[in-house]
Amino acid sequence: AMFSCQSPKSNSAKEETAGIDSMAPNPFITHMYTADPSAHVWADGRLYVYASHDIDPPRGCDLMDRYHVFSTDDMVNWTDHGEILNSSQVPWGRKEGGFMWAPDCAYKDGTYYFYFPHPSDTKWNNSWKIGVATSKEPAANFTVQGYIEGMDPMIDPCVFVDDDGQAYIYNGGGGICKGGKLKDNMIELDGTMRTMEGLVDFHEATWIHKHNGKYYLSYSDNHDDGEKHNRMCYAISDSPLGPWEYKGIYMEPTDSYTNHGSIVEFKGQWYSFYHNSALSGQDWLRSICVDKLYYNPDGTIKMVKQTK
């Protein structure tokens, strides 16, 4: 199922010549409900977003049951590559299905590794595993390979491959964030996971990126004033596994009960991906969005302006 959503304003010659300065309006995916965007730029030069899927009509987060991949080469025209995985394809997964929550993807030596949280038992909350599916393509033909042994039953996998080829995996939930090294096969831990130190008010949604030789761990906090919820925060370290120095908030709450995002550089511009409920007005029918992200000279992140 190929689907391209084009911003109507991009039809003018002026917008076309603006190139990367023009972006599709938010939310940039409007034909289905999406959340938890993990964005990566792969060797083909396109930017890919791996997202979870909210089922309409909403039934909370228990029925999130499949993953789609979206890609762009200009931040204006987006392609839906269709579904790459659902719970019925997970041999070790809970028989009732559902619970396919925020994913991530990594690339190493010709293979794409798709990481997803899924419970193995009817009693889902304490049986979370981080599953791995592999493909030779970034957005199709993924096959489940099992799950990573030795990780706590938490959610929100994030995999970061450093410049030297060493891969790190993170997961979290319930106010705890853990990280560790992966072996070269990308599906086994190299050693044990350890708690990430120095984070303030960590809730969930770990994301790692590197900028000017420093490592950034971003996440959602526990902010709740009754109307506004998760803010996006970040911390900086000289090492992928910390200790981390908390630097503050880079995104204020959206209109959604949750937030979950990623930070990526594409064609010389940094971007912040996140989700809101602008399309539906309902907490569990979310939509992925993106806005430009800027750094201060000292490496701190400026507050991201959420646009429509």
Residue ranges, per PLM feature:
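Sec-dependent bacterial lipoprotein signal peptides
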Residues: 1-3
